[in-house]
Swiss-Prot record:
UniProt xrefs under Pfam families: HTH_25, RodZ_C
Statement: the UniProt record of this protein carries the keyword rRNA-binding: no
Protein name, UniProt field: Cytoskeleton protein RodZ
This protein's record includes keyword Oxidoreductase: no
Organism domain of life: Bacteria
Species of origin: Salmonella gallinarum (strain 287/91 / NCTC 13346)
Length: 334
């Protein structure tokens, strides 16, 4: 009878109550049990009060209860039926749903972040392309404007240069007139000589008549010869006048390795050159310094000023139209 009553009393007690009673009989405190089982005091208290911690899985809680039972010498076989009936260990089943919803929110946030990143990237690429296109268009417009200005300058030079042949023709006509009239004074001398010669016969008279004509022909030939010999003597003077500007210390010498457009003006605003220069061309200019240069392709030209090369590397690196001014440097006294 006593054994059955004890068994019924044990069944009436819960798992936590039995473990607490066993611990008190052994004289152990909750702190001592927690230290031996390597648990928190709050976990031991929850087990004795038949509470299931929300942050603890049921599998771990069952293992803690078995370890607690072995520590206080309570048979595990007596506790297992009580655990099945009481089912105090309620695990939170919402956790998987929470993790799923959390992952969904995180995925949505990552999607928004990726979309924003792509948007910023497209904006940066678009702005870069627009900036490049504006610079390219401005460069092309500048080259077109320079070409139009050079064409207008060439047309103006052609219009002003049409009067040059007329002036040279007048000069040549004035030069040739004295040469043609020069032989005239020689005829009176020959005629006086002819009148002083006596004419004894008709044949002699005919001979004397023919002689002045021959003398005139000879005189014209001899007078024309000095004129012909004097004419080439003027050529070296004109050639020397053309070559004279090259000796100017402020001369500007340019050699072209490729086709290049350029414009050169001096200090007075006079346009010394404006137009296109072809490959392997040379250009010698003289004027009043300083010179203002505008070069479409700096890499295609080599410039020497006052016998020194001009550095165009900064324009070649940036591939821009070169605009520079060459100032006159004082020449040393000799």
């Amino acid at each position: 009878m006593n054994t059955e009553a004890t068994h019924d009393q044990n069944e009436a007690q819960t798992t936590g109550v039995r473990l607490r009673n066993a611990r008190e009989q052994l004289g152990l405190s909750q702190q001592a049990v927690a230290e031996r089982l390597c648990l928190k005091v709050s976990t031991v208290r929850d087990i004795e009060e038949d509470k299931a911690p929300s942050d603890l899985a049921s599998t771990f809680l069952r293992g803690y209860i078995r370890s607690y039972a072995r520590l206080v010498h309570v048979p595990e076989e007596e506790l297992l039926p009580g655990l099945e009936k009481q089912a105090p260990l309620r695990a939170a089943k919402v956790a998987p749903m929470q993790s799923f919803s959390l992952g969904k929110r995180r995925k949505k946030r990552d999607g928004w972040l990726m979309s924003f990143t792509w948007l910023v990237l497209f904006v940066v690429v678009g702005l870069t392309g627009a900036w490049w296109w504006q610079n390219h268009k401005a460069h092309q417009e500048e080259i077109t404007t320079m070409a139009d200005q050079s064409t207008a300058g060439l047309n103006a030079d052609k219009d002003s240069g049409q009067s040059v042949p007329l002036d040279t023709g007048a000069v040549t006509s004035q030069d040739t007139t004295p040469a043609q009239t020069a032989p005239a004074p020689a005829t009176p001398v020959d005629s006086t000589a002819a009148t002083q010669t006596p004419a004894p016969t008709a044949a002699a008279t005919q001979n004397t008549v023919v002689a002045p004509s021959q003398a005139n022909v000879d005189t014209a030939a001899t007078s024309a010869a000095p004129a012909a010999t004097e004419t080439p003597s003027a050529l070296p003077t004109s050639q020397a006048g053309v070559a004279a500007p090259a000796a100017d210390p402020n001369a500007l010498v340019m050699n072209f390795t490729a086709d290049c457009w350029l414009e050169v003006t001096d200090a007075t605003g006079k346009r010394l050159f404006s137009g296109m220069q072809r490959k392997d061309g040379n250009l010698n200019l003289t004027g009043q310094a300083p010179y203002k240069l505008k070069i479409g392709a700096p890499a295609a030209v080599q410039i020497q000023y006052q016998g020194k090369p001009v550095d165009l590397s900064r324009f070649i690196r940036t591939n821009q139209v070169a605009r520079l001014t060459l100032n006159a440097e004082p020449t040393p006294a000799q």
